[in-house]
Amino acid sequence: MNTATGFIVLLVLATVIGCISADFQGGFEPYEEEDAERIFRRSPTCIPTGQPCPYNENCCNQSCTYKANENGNQVKRCD
C-alpha cells in the first residue's frame, strides 16, 4: 500500500468514525419545526421601480402598470 492509498483509507475511516460519534451525540436528529422556519425564513424584499413585476404586491410602492419595453412589447413594470 503506497502513501496516497493509506491516506485515503485513513480519511474514510475518520469520516466513518465521525459520523458514528455524531449519531451517538444526537447530531443527526431532525430539526424542530420552529428551527426550520427560523433558518429558512424569507426576508421581505420588494421589486424596485422600472423592473418587471408579476404581482402588484411585490413592487416597493405597491403599483404595477403596463409599459412598452425596448422591443415595443407591453410588459408590467413597477411604478
From Swiss-Prot:
* One GO MF term: toxin activity
An example of a Gene Ontology cellular component annotation for this protein is: extracellular region
GO biological process entries = defense response
Cysteines engaged in disulfide bonds, as pairs: 46-60, 53-64, 59-78
Question: Keywords on this record?
Answer: Calcium channel impairing toxin, Cleavage on pair of basic residues, Disulfide bond, Ion channel impairing toxin, Knottin, Secreted, Signal, Toxin, Voltage-gated calcium channel impairing toxin
Q: Which Pfam families match?
A: Omega-toxin (PF06357)
The subcellular location is: Secreted
Where exactly are the transmembrane stretches of this chain?
none
What positions belong to the pro-peptide in this record? 23-40
Tissue-wise, where is it found?
Answer: Expressed by the venom gland.
Signal sequence segment: 1-22
Marked site positions, Critical for insecticidal activity = 52, 69, 77
Record comment regarding domains: The presence of a 'disulfide through disulfide knot' structurally defines this protein as a knottin.
Role this protein plays: Inhibits insect, but not mammalian, voltage-gated calcium channels (Cav).
Q: Which family does it belong to?
A: Belongs to the neurotoxin 08 (Shiva) family. 01 (omega toxin) subfamily.
Q: Under what name is this protein listed?
A: Omega-hexatoxin-Hi1d
